[in-house]
Amino acid sequence: MEFPLYTTTLLCGVISSTLLLLLLNKLTTWEHIVPSKVPWIDRRSEPFGYLRAKCRSFFNMKENITEAYYAFNKEGRAAALAIAFGRPQIILPPKYIRWIIDQPESVLSIDPIHNEFHAFVRDGLVGDHLVQEVLRRELAGHLAHLTREMNEEIADSVESVLGVSKEWATVPLRDSMRIIIARISNRLFVGKELCRNEDYIRNAVGLGMAVMPQTLVQDLLPQLLKGPLSFATKLFTRITLAGLSGHLSPVVRQRIQDVQTAEKDQLPLELLTWMAQRALQRGESATSIEEKLIARIAMANLASIETTTNTITKCMEDMTALSNETGGYLELMRQEAHTVLEACNYSPIKADLEKLVHIENALKESLRLAVVFPGLIRQVTSRTGVTLDDGTHLPHGARISVAAYAIHRDDANWTDAARYDPSRHEKASLPMSRGSEQLLSFGLGKRACPGRFFVTDELKLLFAHILTKYEFKVIKPPVTKVGLLKELTMRGPQEQLVIRRVK
């Protein structure tokens, strides 16, 4: 029996497409990296099961982490999760927290994860960790000398974005906070002139929105196709970087010249200065140093803007949504802010920020409940892998973490853990910038978030200005289905901030 030509062609096409899909599925999955004895969460017996689990994880990450924690981690066992952005993660029980942070870089490291994000900005940044080094050392070490600049930018940006009207007005909460955070961050990154340039800030904010979809698409590509297809997947990032470069190039060139010729004590205390100093000390090529410094400033923006925006937004939501329970605490925060800022005539020094205890407690509590991902993520860097004390062997390239989201909500760690209660931190001796095995918002150990000291000062002072000058409440958007593209580009429905100036 003979088949018509079009039928044969169609059949061959279906078979070829099926084989191609199966091959792509094999090339893009990392299931082989998870030991067979480790159980999976939400990995079903279905065609393309791993890829489908990755897609579902974008919407049910919290539930998956909770199941891994209570069904397996609490029993001392590991569990595997498919992750929308990146390789699957093996969620280890909390008893391994100290073990994770004590391992040398030759055994476990976060650098391979950083490298993937560096590649989204510039291929030449893979393996370059100068941004983290400068944030951890120079920025943290100079914060006491930067409080004045930070305070000045907070006051100006809050007034510019939130307004001065004593009539109630409504503004988008997240977008407003994003601009304020971008301005404060860039005041310390590149100086006053650029941080108040609206087009520069628009590009700095847009970088995160351009990179997020790219992280998902690139992870689904086989390794052999990542290079050839990276041009397409990085298109929007390149457009945004071009906008940043137009503003940054002359500033970067001038700063390189200043570092080479000016006295050290005459150089501005900024991230760009310290990066230029280190780059020149390394002997970086004159043909690439400018591009690398621009890319590093972009990386600093990518690392700081969205995460800090999430924290201040979450805290303002918490204080509004639970006002019946925390109304008294909100008044304590407001009184504290008035006392501290009025005593220094709204020109605080570093020591004044240490007095904002109630505000720090509120931020710390919001950080505790804001975490939605696993924490202490590391990749096995030992070529021979590493073996846990229960005999589970983790091969080279495997990624491990702990269930930070669930740890923060475990009643065994926190009384009435699901409840937002800033007063629970009143007796805590640890500052917001330091973590514990029960509070992993900034990570823990020597590889904890390098910008945590800056973020702590920034958010405390920002909240103090808002509390002393405004009345506000947050209105949540109606519950609607949001498309994946809007989620990825952070353009879904957002909370509205109803606000008026009172001082």
From Swiss-Prot:
Designated gene of the protein: ecdH
Cofactor(s), names only, from the UniProt record: heme
Taxonomic path: Eukaryota, Fungi, Dikarya, Ascomycota, Pezizomycotina
Keywords for this protein: Glycoprotein, Heme, Iron, Membrane, Metal-binding, Monooxygenase, Oxidoreductase, Transmembrane, Transmembrane helix
Pathway info: Antifungal biosynthesis
Family: Belongs to the cytochrome P450 family.
UniProt-recorded name of the protein: Cytochrome P450 monooxygenase ecdH
BP-aspect Gene Ontology terms: secondary metabolic process
Enzyme kind, highest EC tier: oxidoreductase
Membrane topology of the entry: Single-pass membrane protein
Protein task: Cytochrome P450 monooxygenase; part of the gene cluster that mediates the biosynthesis of echinocandin B, a fungal lipidated cyclic hexapeptide that acts as an antifungal agent. Linoleoyl-AMP, produced by the fatty-acyl-AMP ligase ecdI, is transferred to the initiation carrier domain (T0) of ecdA. The linoleoyl-S-phosphopantetheinyl-T0 is sequentially extended with L-ornithine, L-threonine, L-proline, L-homotyrosine, L-threonine, and 4R-methyl-L-proline to form the linear hexapeptide.
Glycosylation sites per record: N64, N324, N413
Cellular localisation: Membrane
Coiled-coil boundaries: none
